[in-house]
Regions:
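Active-site neighborhood of HAD-like aspartate-dependent phosphohydrolases
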Residues: 1-40
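Generic, low-specificity signal for short hydrophobic/alpha-helical stretches with a mild N-terminal bias
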Residues: 16-19, 42, 46, 131, ...
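Conserved short-loop catalytic and cofactor-binding motifs
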Residues: 22, 48, 83
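Acidic-and-aromatic substrate-binding clefts and catalytic sites of carbohydrate-active enzymes
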Residues: 24-25, 53-56, 84-86
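Generic alpha-helix structural propensity
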Residues: 29-32, 46, 55, 90
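A structural signal for short coil/turn segments at secondary-structure junctions
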Residues: 38-41, 102-104
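Substrate-recognition element of Asp-dependent hydrolases with the DxDx(T/V) motif
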Residues: 41-61
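C-terminal cap/substrate-recognition subdomain and adjoining C-terminal extension
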Residues: 58-162
Length: 162
């Protein structure tokens, strides 16, 4: 993958020259699970991935679209990535800073992340931990995690009077 992006950046190839890499970048089941959640809740996305430090927005959009996540590319929040500057080293600090600048999100958000070990995750603030769903990094989003996200968003919806 890194070679493909590097070759594209140097002008030695185009995005479409690496279609096989994009098609296999994300496993089909996690993409299906995320698409089902997207269709149900009309999600918007902010990325915390390290990719945002390597790719600009145009490149990120290309990777998302070519790898089957066009619905994510089309629904990125206007501030589509967390700010990695201003001394925020831990991902939890980056997410909290993003949320503090986007109070319009209220509690209408969920962090979906791979299970990462270490002090950054173990010491997440309680308010972030309550909104976080972790999936196995070698498996991705399964029906189990998607169910937890669905339950969280259903709890956030205003109750309907009959």
């Amino acid at each position: 993958m890194a070679d493909a992006v590097s070759n594209i950046a140097r002008g030695n190839s185009t995005w479409r020259d690496h279609q096989d890499a994009w098609e296999n970048l994300f496993a089909a089941e996690p993409v299906r699970q995320l698409k089902a959640l997207h269709d149900q809740f009309q999600l918007r996305y902010c990325l915390t991935t390290n990719w945002t430090g390597l790719l600009d927005k145009a490149a990120t959009l290309n990777v998302l679209r070519l790898s089957g996540l066009g619905f994510v590319a089309s629904n990125l929040h206007a501030r589509w990535e967390v700010d990695r500057g201003h001394g925020a080293v831990r991902r939890s600090d980056q997410i909290e800073a993003w949320l503090s600048h986007h109070s319009d999100q209220h509690d209408q958000w969920v962090v979906l992340d791979s299970e990462v070990r270490g002090p950054d995750v173990l010491n997440w603030p309680e308010n972030l931990a309550a909104h976080t769903v972790s999936c196995c990094s070698d498996v991705g989003l399964t029906g189990f995690e998607a169910g937890a996200i669905r339950e969280r968003f259903l709890q956030l919806q205003p109750s309907q009077k009959n």
